[in-house]
């Protein structure tokens, strides 16, 4: 269900507002600027068509990132702080057995980049589009990444 998963660790990150140029580009395509890291991932996705996701690496406690499914009804808190119950078919990116991201759909709140973030894990992946679509529809979550 995941044909390619690549990641890069970037240390010494300083979270700050994006440049006016990047903010204006995002606003022109209907996106709200958030911070330099999130904004550049959104801009890359819109300009190149490749979704990226940034995680705060210091929040990943198991020391390993896994792509898998979890038990039915496992609770996952999304970036917008909504709690959803996963189905046993939802592909997720995990910190051990803790869901960090709905694969190809939406990130998780607990691992999000914020003003205290110093190190990120930047993900670029290709997930099975049928799996992404099913997960997106199952939870009524439509994001630019899930198209």
Task: Go through each PLM region and give its residues.
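RNA/tRNA-interacting regions in translation and RNA-turnover enzymes
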Residues: 1-147
């Amino acid at each position: 269900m995941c044909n390619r998963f690549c990641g890069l660790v970037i240390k010494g990150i300083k979270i700050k507002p994006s440049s006016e140029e990047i903010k204006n580009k995002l606003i022109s395509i209907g996106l709200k600027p958030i911070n330099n890291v999130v904004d550049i991932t959104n801009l890359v996705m819109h300009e190149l068509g490749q979704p990226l996701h940034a995680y705060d690496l210091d929040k990943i406690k198991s020391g390993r990132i896994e792509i898998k499914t979890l038990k039915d009804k496992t609770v996952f808190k999304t970036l917008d702080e909504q709690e959803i119950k996963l189905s046993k078919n939802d592909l997720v990116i995990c910190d051990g057995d803790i869901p960090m991201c709905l694969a190809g759909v939406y990130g998780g709140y607990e691992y999000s980049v914020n003003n205290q973030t110093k190190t990120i894990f930047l993900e670029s992946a290709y997930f099975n589009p049928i799996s992404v679509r099913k997960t997106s529809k199952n939870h009524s979550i439509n994001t630019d990444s899930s198209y």
